[in-house]
Amino acid sequence: MKNKQNRLLVVLVGAFAIGIGREPASAQTDTEHTARFVGSEACKGCHVRVYDDWKQTRMANVVRDPKEHPEAVLGDFANPDAVRTFTLEDVAFVYGSRYKQRYFAKRGDDYYPLPAQWDIAKKRWLPYHVEPGTDWWVPYYGPSNFDRPTGPTCDGCHSVNYDITTKTVTEWNVGCEKCHGPGSEHVAHPTKSNIVNPGTLDAIRGNDVCMQCHSQGRPLSNPIDGKYYDWPVGFKPGERLADFWKLEELKLGTTGFYQYPDRTAHKNRMQGNDFVQSTMYHRQLRCFDCHDVHSNRNESNLIETGNELCLGCHNRQNPAGLKGTVSEHTHHAAGSAGSQCIACHMPHLEQTIKDNYVAAHTFRFISPVESEQSGIPNPCTSCHADKTNAWAIEALKKWQNVSPWRVAN
């Protein structure tokens, strides 16, 4: 099995491909005031393999123009449907390709959501509307999606260099410069000091690169020219996200649009809100220690799949080896669904579309006792759907209270 050091080397070389060894943020951003955005195509000449891999990822293909990319349209426009009241001709571009796909029309120089979304897993149309009182935009944009231009609410994360004044972008989708910052200086004179390498930033700033979009919150600068934004306007990689963005406040014991009672995310795009609550985050783990953002090798862009990823770190103290560790810790046979680390520590919790799920990123085991008290789903009865919380509580009493192994401190 690969150990942690080998995996991190893969991350830093393969995922970022610009160098190893951490540098102060200032050393990497000395040209931030002079560098311009040039687009991902400018990176391809030197980083051919990384570019080609990235080009196949969802990051590079979430936003598509259906006229240029008809294959990107996943919804059924051929058959009439009472939920879908618009035609493909009304669609200026589409968002999404994994859980749901949403459709947007152009009105003036802005884009607006159309009233139905495609549930990709169930292959069905569902209403796309805002439930009254479920998000903080209502006082500023009204309860209807048709009053909400995508510039303030969506486009900053689904593009590179969205200009809030001209409403233009360098490119749609998450391109190289979304994570590495403006690249003109680096393209002209490639050095480590004139481009941001998230892999060599400190853990907080490194995670901020991902959390600029993978978190729910509000810009500190709201409102801007009378508009309220749902992404960190002005933030660039290498800077502190906290100077631009305040994470949504999650209150213990409250069930709501954003959270379960234990503050675990109840909505998509909240991996960062989960992660900052975790021991992993406070131990300096970074998003890209697990995810290869340039890779399309598996569904979640993981460096390794299954238990291999977790046990690269969480297996050092157990002489029993891989199979013994899994069986001892999970009380399930190695190779079974219940023996997967993520089955208990990253359970899939229902998100905004019914029957669609997001993986919790607190890495905390949610006990059936908590389910009994507050109604939050737990991993035990999520798998053993025919059982009750009371059954799961009794079953866990027979387990060891302390894990027989931990990662070394």
Label the model's feature ranges.
Residues K106, N145-F146:
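Short, charge-rich binding segments
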Residues T29-F37, E41, V48-P139, D163-N409:
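Primarily the internal scaffold of c-type cytochrome electron-transfer domains
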Residues C46, C157:
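Short HxH-centered metal-ligating active-site micro-motif
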Residues V10-G19:
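Bacterial N-terminal signal peptides
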Residues P132-P139, D147-T153, S159:
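A gly/proline- and charged-residue-enriched helix-loop-helix capping module
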